[in-house]
Amino acid sequence: VRLAAMRVVGVGAGAWGLPAAAELAGRGHEVTLVDRSGPANDLSSSPGPTRLWRLTHPDPVRVRLALRSVEAMERLEARTGTTVHLRRGLLWRDDAGPGDVHEALRGEGVAHEVVDPQDVGRFLPGLRPDDRPAVWCEGAGPVLAAASMRAQLGLFEAAGGVLERALVRGVEPVAGGVRVHVDRQAPLTADVAVLAPGPGAVGLLEGLDVRLRLRPRLEQVVHFGDAADPGATDGYACFVDRPHFADDGDEVPNLYAMPTPGRGYKVGIDRPLRDLVEGDTDRTPSERTTADITDRVRRDITGVPPRPLDAQVCSWTESPDGRFVLDTLPGGVVLACGDSGEGFKFSALMGLVLADLAEGRTPDADVAAFSLARFATV
């Protein structure tokens, strides 16, 4: 069913906001997308060449959404002729054992293999074994993030979408729609506003009287490899090494890793550089964090040269429970925030999900599980 054309203002041109704007424009709506610095800018959560997609999750809802996300990426590729994801497989190692992941994957019919602790190096060269079994799943690989954003921008522009670089100061439901207050210009009026502002959600939600404890923070990743041949690890598998305790009793933070074609093996650990506050535009990598990640690679992933080739800082926004927040607010406002470090793996799917919410469609049970209702008693 094709709905009557609406006026839509999107706030945030990142991994969720740009695909939503592109999808809505493609459905025939009049879409203006507002972002202070433009799509996937260096201050946002969405810059850089790659992210990690995976079917491996410890709960069935996210496994199902991940399967839908792969379909959405394939749809984007078919529409644009652009490759936006690669398949390399992923090894998941967890202090809790493979139980939850194994059950979630098996329940959704996803092929996988439980790997003995001493056999992990068969899937990732040089991975140091310990006493933890792992789970191997071929359904994983790099999202070609920059290519994906370019493809979405092309769809948005081809469908007549308008991009404005401006700072959004507030969003106000009014009779018959919504008013978006923009710095140094007249407010924008629309039937619906789609808010996917990343860290900017903190201030905008306060103005909408939504009480949600979001925590924007800065994280860092490092590419490793041989400078003379940075593509040597292009065929390597991805890896998630969940938090655990070392032999000496120290807590070891979560590690995630993937190949970036032609650039090296990308590794990050879940240890924020600092909380992100309004006005913080410094994205200088931390030498201490680079050294810590290098030590981890040298110790645990010996098949990757422990030589940093580059480092990058970007923002995450943690929700109170580490899960996305997707909902429709009274007065024609669609909310998408709390990426919690996993936003890009669902980027193409979020375009479809948020467009459906903007059109007033009832979300399915899996999408509805991410609504604000779960915080009603928090």
Predicted regions and their residues:
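Beta1/beta-strand and adjacent pyrophosphate-binding region of the FAD-binding site
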Residues: L3-W16
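Short hydrophobic core segments
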Residues: V11, P187-G200, G351
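Active-site substrate-recognition segment that forms the wall
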Residues: A22-G26, T82-H85, P199-G331
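Glycine-rich FAD pyrophosphate-binding loop
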Residues: G26-S45
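Dinucleotide-binding Rossmann-like beta1-alpha1 core, especially the glycine-rich loop
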Residues: P49-F123, D131-R132, N254-L255
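Flavin (FAD/FMN) cofactor-binding and adjacent substrate-gating region
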Residues: R93-G160, E164-R165, G170-A175
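Conserved beta-strand-loop-beta-strand element in the redox core of flavoprotein oxidoreductases
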Residues: G170-L188
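C-terminal catalytic lobe of FAD-dependent flavoproteins
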Residues: R299-V378
